[in-house]
Amino acid sequence: RAEGSHGRAQQVQAERLQASADQLRAAASAVHATPELALFAGEGERGSARLLQAESLVLPHGCRAPLQLDIRRGQRIAVVGDNGSGKSTLLRVLAGQLPARSGNVQRHAPLALLDQQLLGLSGERSILDTVQAANPAADTGELRTRLALLGLDAQRIQRAAHHLSDGERVKGALASVLYADPAPQMLLLDEPGNALDLGALQALEELLVAWPGALVMVSHDRHLLQALQPTQVLQVSAEGWQWRDAL
């Protein structure tokens, strides 16, 4: 009975999260479309074709079944499963932030982990300063051009982050990751849309759709996952890992 109650509680929570996301999508249809955004050409497309391998990987928390991974350029993997099954733990192990229980991970290209904390750019520092700190050798004029392609004009990129909209902060935070040196060829997305307002959610979706690199993504927002066009779905449960072709 306890297991059944826990399962129903998880289902109710998932339905509430999806309902909230659906309300945001409905609101989006009632406002004007945002100007088209563009990433600087070539980002995420360079370097190794094989980005990451994991062999007999067992997580420290959640699912205890071993996992084999071979992630290549252009793949977009949606990781789905119940709360507590190990989705976020997997991303942190792949990023090197947590040690695996057993097995190994080989990273053949730069990657970055994006979560709601990183996307919550705040404080007195400007977007331009944040991006320059991530790529000190870059030409300032080139960085300004790249930020302009994201819809961030010369005035906005000089303002303190706490004076910007949520959407502008998301663009700035993503720019500091995507235009870093070295630039990532793969993004690990851990519930990136959580706690974002409508404008920020739209900006996040548009930029990630436009980015050509590989993605491994965890989100309760099914619409966001679908918009990012996963090439594969990795289902995790207490029994183990299972590959699917669609959500």
Where do the model's predicted regions map?
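Coupling and communication elements adjacent to P-loop NTPase active sites across diverse families
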Residues: 1-61, 72
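ABC ATP-binding cassette signature C-motif
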Residues: 46-247
